[in-house]
Regions:
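The conserved beta-strand core of Leucine-Rich Repeat
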Residues: 1-327
Length: 327
């Protein structure tokens, strides 16, 4: 759709012929998909406003894509919200795209229990990158149940996922951890939010010991049951660092986190001392505590030694989240 907008901008005389694309579903895209003999890559990114639509503008597109399931290995979609229209077809047919290597969905799609069961049954032998935003963890867990053997990257913005949980976060995050270590032995990049319960930490440590190829973690420890004290927040950070040391992740090169847990100066130094024989670490955080002088001195010390490769603080959550550059 971006190309169409640019065409109208640079060639005003084209507007009369193309303006209908803004007021009704674009069935021409569906026809274009239908004539492709070996369609492997499909990407849709909405950036226009739809007005007065009475039918789903994407239905015919998905029906056409469904017929290309035997060849399609890259699917990326971002749809804008359209008042009065529920997008339901993608959820119904997603389990049929068994050849996918990359699946990216940057929008909320509600999945019924029946649709989740279909996802669990589908085997995605070739799936390597899974990026689903604005959805519950059980959607991702369902996809990897029989399709995680080749997965190298499971990426999402943790806070957006947590916002969708509505009281099911503790249960779903625990199940998510288990599905990862049961089904994703090759995982390298992983977004992972979980509760600071003893059971969650135990399962997370098990994940780290099984998934030895991990290179990067985006971590969120979120207590949905109560507001934690500062002592509890530091305690979660200390437990996490001890787990990382015990896990002996020789390939781990990067840790990303926000400010939902903190490392005391003493715990961080102990961790870095014990990390000396492993890979150089890059650390990215939005927590301004690490801008304090005593933390900066400690970080610079271990940069000079060669244990820390890079330490970046940013108030922009978008710079801590994974972005599409690593896809």
């Amino acid at each position: 759709m971006k190309l169409i907008k640019h065409q109208i901008f640079y060639f005003p005389e084209a507007k009369i012929r193309l303006e209908s694309l803004y007021s009704k579903p674009n069935h021409g895209i569906a026809k274009l998909i239908e004539v492709q003999r070996n369609l492997k890559h499909f990407e849709w990114n909405d950036d226009i406003d739809y007005d007065y639509l009475t039918e789903d503008p994407y239905e015919k597109i998905f029906l056409a894509l469904e017929k290309k399931a035997d060849s399609l290995n890259y699917l990326r979609v971002y749809f804008q919200y359209i008042e009065g229209i529920d997008h339901i077809l993608l959820q119904q047919i997603l389990s049929k795209f068994y050849k996918l290597k990359i699946l990216i969905i940057d929008d909320f799609f509600f999945f019924t229990e029946e649709q989740l069961e279909k996802l669990k049954l589908q085997v995605y032998n070739d799936l390597e990158i899974l990026n689903i935003e604005w959805n519950k963890l059980n959607v991702i867990s369902s996809i990897i149940e029989n399709g995680g053997r080749s997965l190298k990257k499971i990426l999402f913005r943790p806070y957006d996922i947590i916002e969708c949980e509505y009281g099911s976060f503790n249960k779903n995050s625990l199940n998510f951890i288990r599905k990862i270590y049961e089904n994703c032995p090759s995982i390298e990049y992983l977004s992972i939010p979980f509760s600071p319960s003893k059971e969650h930490f135990t399962e997370f440590e098990k994940l780290l010991k099984i998934c030895k190829n991990l290179k990067s973690l985006l971590l969120v420890i979120c207590n949905m049951d109560k507001i934690e004290t500062i002592e509890e927040i530091y305690e979660s950070g200390e437990i996490l660092l001890k787990i990382l040391i015990r896990s002996e992740l020789i390939n781990l090169k990067e840790i990303r986190f926000y400010d939902d847990f903190k490392f005391s100066l003493e715990s961080l130094e102990e961790f870095l001392e014990k990390w000396f024989d492993k890979s150089k670490l890059s650390i990215f955080t939005s927590d301004s505590i690490y801008e304090e002088e005593n933390y900066k001195n400690l970080i610079n010390k271990y940069k000079r030694i060669g244990i820390i490769k890079d330490f970046k603080h940013s108030l922009l959550i978008s710079e801590i989240n994974y972005n599409f550059n690593i896809l």
